[in-house]
């Protein structure tokens, strides 16, 4: 087949050469394109933009106590004790928290669980600005969230940080 034999101009039949008349959708306007692909994400969007920002934690992110000096200063702070935790605090310009869970509490998985619970409890409480140290006792591993919550509040009340 030679190039001379191939038609370069569409045939003038008045129909779209891609679809025959019987296969055409009569309700679709001529020249309409396919709808954009459906789904949660647009092709150019990143997941974080499409889903939206992650909601903030109930009380916001807690700032950690940093350095040995901060922990040493807390030795002179006001103290309170509960069944599962003991707390010490000093007034400060911002709220900073140190959580101590010793190996006596259990293996790493158990210690991390206790720390996560204590961090969440402290986030939920609206604490005044202070440097706060929370030390978990070995019995804290048996406490559920509600018991630990009540005990932290009890210790904070005894220390005078909250009413």
UniProtKB/Swiss-Prot annotation:
The gene is rnpA. RNaseP catalyzes the removal of the 5'-leader sequence from pre-tRNA to produce the mature 5'-terminus. It can also cleave other RNA substrates such as 4.5S RNA. The protein component plays an auxiliary but essential role in vivo by binding to the 5'-leader sequence and broadening the substrate specificity of the ribozyme. GO terms for cellular component: ribonuclease P complex. The keyword Transmembrane helix does not apply. Belongs to the RnpA family. Keywords: Endonuclease, Hydrolase, Nuclease, RNA-binding, tRNA processing. Consists of a catalytic RNA component (M1 or rnpB) and a protein subunit. Residues 1-68 are annotated as: Disordered. GO terms for biological process: tRNA 5'-leader removal. It is an enzyme of class 3 (hydrolase). The open reading frame (ORF) for this protein entirely encompasses the ORF for the 50S ribosomal protein L34 (rpmH). The two start codons are separated by four nucleotides. This is Ribonuclease P protein component. Residues 8-19 have a biased composition (Polar residues). One of its GO terms (molecular function) is tRNA binding. InterPro entries: Ribosomal_Su5_D2-typ_SF, Ribsml_uS5_D2-typ_fold_subgr, RNase_P, RNase_P_CS. It comes from Thermus thermophilus (strain ATCC 27634 / DSM 579 / HB8). NCBIfam families: rnpA (TIGR00188).
